[in-house]
Amino acid sequence: MSYVMDETEEGINIDNTQHDLELDRDSSTQQPAQTHEDDGDLLGLDKPIKLKTRAKIAKVDNQRIFNHNGIPLLVKTHSKLLRTLKKNDKNFYSEPRSSISKSQKFEHEYENLSSVLQFYQLWCHGLFPKATFKDCIHLIRALGARSPQLRLYRRELIAAELHKLKVAKGIIADENQDAPSIPEEENTTDPSNEEWNSMHMSALVPGSSNKNGLFVDSNSNEDFETTNEVNAAASLADKDALSTDDKAEQTNAITSDTHNNDVDSDDPFSDDDDINIDAHTENLHPASGTQHQDRPKETTEENEDLELELMREYGA
């Protein structure tokens, strides 16, 4: 009772506290009933599954930058920007004034820059509506650094504009054949590159139908057959010349040996035999560095037959 009296003195309502206690009891009795109901579907297999579609992440790529809202739109509409700049310059310099101050020049440049920025802001908004102007510029710069297609497109545009300026100033003559054309949206491949790639692949792929697969022009074999025949004839002529030289040296050595043997056959203690042996070795191995070895006829004929078979396999 003393506790209740203290609460009443402090201004606490006893009726509200009793009501709160009753609510707590009711909630405690209702919680076990709910748990018994949920015991049958603990894993949630009977609950309906809500499918959510993932939103596509917008990004700046070659497909977006080369569509009708990308760089082709800039190429078509940049003439309007040039006209506005010329109009601003004409209005600025047409006003009658004695002198132009620096502040007036800065204001005029500010107007031109604001028109340029507005032009590119509208273009970026049409290209990438969800991105800010700063983010769009950053994404386009990153794409230009890693996309070779975009770099090639930009170089061709610059070359076309330089050609127009040179023609306008009279530096070069206006020839439609020499004028660089503005690149199209679709990628056009060079036929020479396709031929080179096909020839390169035919050379690298083993087991191809072409016999001369290691050569560049693997389909035409007539030129290689003629060259192989010429090379074979030249090699045979060289071998015949070498064989005749070897035979002449052998005959010279044999005649010198027989002559020395006939002269000094009676002297068993003569030293001419060693001299003849040295002369024979010198004839076989001259000092010029070219070694002519005594090759038997059988080995040379076998080597020639093998070389002819190899030339027929690779050259036929």
From Swiss-Prot:
Signal peptide: none annotated. Pfam families: Swi3. Residues 1-12, 263-276 have a biased composition (Acidic residues). GO terms for molecular function: DNA binding. InterPro entries: Csm3 (IPR012923), TIPIN/Csm3/Swi3 (IPR040038). GO terms for biological process: DNA damage response; DNA repair; DNA replication checkpoint signaling; meiotic cell cycle; replication fork arrest; replication fork processing. Its main location: nucleus. The keyword DNA damage applies. Belongs to the CSM3 family. This is Chromosome segregation in meiosis protein 3. It comes from Candida albicans (strain SC5314 / ATCC MYA-2876) (Yeast). The lineage of its organism: Eukaryota, Fungi, Dikarya, Ascomycota, Saccharomycotina. The gene is CSM3.
